[in-house]
């Protein structure tokens, strides 16, 4: 009987193994869409540039209004100039106030006395903070500015896109320095303009050369 039962089992229909579909890419694309990714990237750039503008206002002993104005101008000024150039009106900063609110909130926090003491304690710390925040904001806004001009305004001309990226990445800093009566950073020995242009050209090359698989589509 055991042999018969075993034979019956062996002669029965085999259940074919069907591997479960891989849901990694689908799940990832649902959780982190391109729109969400760019939104988070723009928020990070907004915070970085708001810190940059507010800290410079604190260094010049401005009141809370001046610190807040410099933080907001640095954070959203480049984006406003970009939108005016490509014809997106009203500018996105006024359509979605989250960027203005984030920049204002960061500026107010940095104005607190204990935060100002930490920042002003060391010139080395101040210079390092400014370098990191400016570099982060410049890189983020150069790329997101070009992407916005492409997706929302339909810009395809490479020269215009590189200019828009430069304007988005450096425009806020230029307005910040003008408000404080300083010569803009990009007109001095700093390489902000050159770095923004180089980053914009590299971004265009990567978009042109990518093989359009999932990962490349997600980022480019």
Q: What do the PLM-derived regions correspond to, one by one?
A:
Residues 33-36, 84-94, 144-160, 207-216:
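Helix-coil boundary and interhelical linker segments in multi-pass alpha-helical membrane proteins
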Residues 54, 69-73, 80-86, 163, ...:
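Short, structured motif recognition centered on aromatic/hydrophobic residues
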Residues 103-147:
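Ordered, amphipathic secondary-structure segments that act as subunit-interaction surfaces
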């Amino acid at each position: 009987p055991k042999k018969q039962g075993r034979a019956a089992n062996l002669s029965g229909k085999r259940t074919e193994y069907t591997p479960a579909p891989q849901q990694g890419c689908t799940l990832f694309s649902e959780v982190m869409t391109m729109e969400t990714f760019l939104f988070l990237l723009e928020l990070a750039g907004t915070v970085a540039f708001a810190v940059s503008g507010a800290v410079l206002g604190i260094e010049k002993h401005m009141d809370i209004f001046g610190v807040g104005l410099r933080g907001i101008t640095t954070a959203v000024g480049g984006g406003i100039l970009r939108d005016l150039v490509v014809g997106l009106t009203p500018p996105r900063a006024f359509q979605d106030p989250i960027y203005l609110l984030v920049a204002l909130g960061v500026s107010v926090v940095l104005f607190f006395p204990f935060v100002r003491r930490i920042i002003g304690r060391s010139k080395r710390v101040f210079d390092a903070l400014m370098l990191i925040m400016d570099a982060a904001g410049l890189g983020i806004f150069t790329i997101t500015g070009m992407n916005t001009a492409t997706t929302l305004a339909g810009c395809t001309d490479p020269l215009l896109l590189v200019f828009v990226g430069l304007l988005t990445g450096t425009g806020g800093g230029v307005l910040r320095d003008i408000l404080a009566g300083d010569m803009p950073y990009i007109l001095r020995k700093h390489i902000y303009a050159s770095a923004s242009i180089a980053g914009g050209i590299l971004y265009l090359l990567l978009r042109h050369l990518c093989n359009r698989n999932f990962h490349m589509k997600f980022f480019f």
